[in-house]
Amino acid sequence: MEEFKRYLELDRSQQHDFVYPLIFQEYIYALAHDHGLTRSIFLENIGYDNKFSLLIVKHLIIQMYQQNHFLFSANDSNQNPFFGHNTNLYSQMILEGFVAVVEIPFSLFSLEGKEIVKSQNLRSIHSIFPFLEDKFSHLNYVLDILIPHSIHLEISVQTLRYWVKDASSLYLLRFFLHMYWNWNSLITPKKSSFYFSKRNQRLFLFLYNFHICEYESIFVFLRKQSSHLRSISSGTFLERRYFYGKIEHFLEVFTKDFQVILWLFKDPFIHYVRYQGKYILASKGTSLLMNKWKSYLVNFWQCYFYMWSQPGRIHINQLSKHSPDFLGYLSSVRLNPSMVRSQMLENSFLIGNAIKRFDTIVPIIPMIGSLSKAKFCNVLGHPISKPVWADLSNSDIIDRFGRIYRNLSHYHSGSSKKTSLYRIKYILRLSCARTLARKHKSTVRAFLKRLGSELLEEFFMGEEQVFSLTFPSSTSQGLYRRRIWYLDIVCINDLASHE
């Protein structure tokens, strides 16, 4: 970042106008690709130690604009992912360098702005589980909402114009955006069919977080009492860049327009949580209040941000009757009845008391579906072998299966009931045994009889054993009876991931 500042050497009012020239700087591509400055393919002459590649980058950008990328189909994208075999790698690097460049104005302002530290409501993803346990037992309703997206790519460019006023950079951004004919890839980059979608998730994260930053700067202002929890998909771009600056601007410009609906936000018990492309509003209010929130949110997105939001994307759930799905947990609030005997002089009587309890359950059906998709079992949950791992050594096979189970057990350690985890352990253990038997061209029974069932026990360490290693043995039994949240694992996206 100091390199960026030394290069720009501009007033804050002029920094926006000089983003595009950075695309022609050699160190931009070194930072984007983690390459050395003297070994990049963008150097015009070998051994020439300058940091400009103006002619090469300019020539490639002209070539990109001249190509008719609408002629390529989804089937051609694998063989010709960009615009031809000659410019494939160069175009890829220009796109990644452009993403690094367009983040610079936001990064510079984030370093200069220090008011953001004052907020006590901006929290990380690790706060979600303690938040659920502490707050949900006192709440009644939850609005489960899918974050809407723009109905046209140009809306995203126009929104970005207010922060990056460099026309050339916006033209280049518009060009890259129109290469993605599947707009859903912006919200869920894993579903994109383009070759560079997996290699350029930084672009998706930047646009997505900027999209979130815009609406939260107004929405979170209206709910100062909310528990704002940051998204998992924060990537390299901090979401809350201009939170306090935009609040002051909002007070001056929009306060009068919202006087009619400000009464809606007087509920002191409403909480805001965002995660994985969704957000929830949890309240202690009534069903009528939540329906008013639902109606307002639809108009809020469509009128002020031109985002397509349907009422069907917002679900009102009563916590006592419905179990919302939060980051792999089914969360619910249950009444735990209890009877207390009271005695006064010679008379005794029973007092009924119902205590709300927050329960978290591992959803076994989605878990089995994920294991089935990763080829560890069939759709009914019957374990099968993993043929693609059969060529590995015994220790590697066991280590991969064991790592998956330990991660799942670690992540779901806060569950109120461990029955689902025992079934997952059974599926993975038997799948591991069948994979080893397939490798040695034997049956599972014969293989375990020859090597012993203790071979798998070492790698499928139970959660109690892991917990006993974390706390002293004298206190582990007492603490283990309570729900424990491990906050060192943020999320598990792919069960078969071992890289």
Curated annotation (Swiss-Prot):
Pfam families: Intron_maturas2 (PF01348), MatK_N (PF01824). One of its GO terms (molecular function) is RNA binding. The keyword Membrane does not apply. Keywords: Chloroplast, mRNA processing, Plastid, RNA-binding, tRNA processing. Signal peptide: none annotated. GO terms for biological process: mRNA processing; RNA splicing; tRNA processing. It comes from the Eukaryota. It is found in: Plastid, Chloroplast. InterPro entries: Domain_X (IPR024937), Maturase_MatK (IPR002866), Maturase_MatK_N (IPR024942). GO terms for cellular component: chloroplast. Usually encoded in the trnK tRNA gene intron. Probably assists in splicing its own and other chloroplast group II introns. Belongs to the intron maturase 2 family. MatK subfamily. This is Maturase K.
